């Protein structure tokens, strides 16, 4: 049995994540977008439409080409705003880091279960 306290390590990981460059960039980019209520509103509307689109895809519903085109155009339009484009870049980098960490943990757990 190891003397390692998993909860202490989890807190250590959480601190490391919140001090990481991807996390800090994401927080800063989010603050920049939130300074402008119109940008925040546009971003929330886009997220809502993306969620509806994803839900329809998961349920296997037919999605009209027009809907796909409208969503793509809406994303392209909102991405013209530098602060929002930076937010998307920062969010993508943070999510990638977070997913990588989850994958590392999952692989370690799976290999332990296989032993």
UniProtKB/Swiss-Prot annotation:
Q: Which InterPro entries match?
A: Com_YlbF, YheA/YmcA-like_dom_sf
| Pfam family of the protein (one) | Com_YlbF
Which Gene3D superfamilies does the UniProt entry name for this protein? YheA/YmcA-like
Q: Which residues cross the membrane?
A: none
Highest taxon, organism lineage: Bacteria
- Report the sequence similarity comment from the record: Belongs to the UPF0342 family.
Q: What is this protein called?
A: UPF0342 protein Swol_0655
């Amino acid at each position: 049995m190891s003397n390692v306290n998993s909860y202490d390590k989890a807190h250590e990981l959480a601190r490391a994540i919140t001090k990481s460059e991807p996390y800090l960039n994401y927080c800063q980019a989010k603050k920049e977008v939130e300074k402008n209520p119109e940008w925040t509103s546009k971003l929330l509307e886009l997220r809502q439409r993306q969620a509806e689109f994803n839900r329809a895809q998961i349920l296997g519903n037919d999605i009209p080409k027009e809907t796909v085109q409208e969503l793509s155009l809406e994303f392209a339009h909102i991405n013209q705003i530098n602060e929002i484009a930076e937010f998307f870049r920062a969010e993508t980098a943070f999510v990638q880091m977070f997913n990588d960490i989850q994958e590392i943990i999952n692989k370690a757990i799976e290999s332990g279960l296989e032993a």
